[in-house]
Amino acid sequence: MTIVPKGFQFAVAAAGFKRADRNDLGLIVSQGEAAAAGVFTKNLFQAAPVLVCKELLGERPLARALLVNSGQANACTGAEGLANCRATLELAAKAAGVAPNDVLPTSTGVIGAQLKMDKWAAAAPLLAANLGQASAMDVAKAMMTTDSFPKLSAKAVALPGGEVRVLGMCKGAGMICPNMATMLGFILCDADVEPQAWQEILSFAADRSFNALTVDGDTSTNDTVLALANGASRVSAKDAKSLKLLRAAVTEICQELSYRIVQDAEGGTKVAHITVRGAKNNAQAELAARAIGNSPLVKTALFGCDPNWGRIVAALGRSGADFAPEAVVLTIGGILVFEKGQPSPEDLDALLAPSMRHQDVEIVLDLCAGRGVFTLLASDLTKRYVEINADYRT
């Protein structure tokens, strides 16, 4: 049974945005005012709900409800799209019994189409009737687009003042690169925490999870992770020790969700754990890891269980990271593959074959140039990925 923080209710409805036979609208409502935090896409084309969320959080870092629809991105929809987004806040607020500026909206789906406001108007009363009847799992399912399974993670955390609960849910399977691409995530907590500290916790966790994965190198217009902490547990998280424990818990949940996103990559069969260490700094390590994780040649080698280490080294060499090639050490699955500018003299194909057949493949590069380190989760690239995205709108 999923651990659910105190003071939250859930609702879902089938609005028919994409298909008539599935829930595609979700609502999460806090019983009281909650500290609210958000992290968003860095794409310059930002969807209407992203712009509205940023505006609302900029005015006051507090909220009562989170709203999500799947099937319609409401991105690149101009002034009409913004007006429609604000209209959905009115509808959701009425369903939740809160003020419109207490609702933070999110959307995912096809870019460029206006929201079907007639369907929104018809579905809002269904949300109201379902509030408190649905579960967190129901909302996680309603968020899905090309995902093959819902993604939830939760845990109880013992703080000095007592136990609090943290629940995370997300959707995402394609167009995933840095900054939560086509990825929506919600983090719920019942600790009593100040809004600024809550934002710092979310930003810290996102940098070590949702911003450290890649499926296909594309960054969406709608990336959003929102977090609410409503204090319903009556346990304070305002001292340094409590904040550190809470930050660790939120980070762990976000990392678990990130792993599940890559695990569920469209058509994916592998999760590559790419660690670059010994870089001049962390930024250089990230640059190198992303070049490898986003390389189509590396990804297709992973899919084919091909221990083609040359593709990894070639991607590293064009990454822009500063290092001496002769100093690089590469291991795959713990097996030494490359050092001193040349491959290991062992029969690498035979040695690496078992590791390459695993779902999780560990790739570690030491640049021997400093103390920078970065770990990236990356998927492979398969025929099924091409089929899913070729047929996405048909």
What kind of region is each of these model predictions?
Residues 1-90, 94-394:
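A structural signal for small-residue-enriched, beta-sheet-centric alpha/beta enzyme cores
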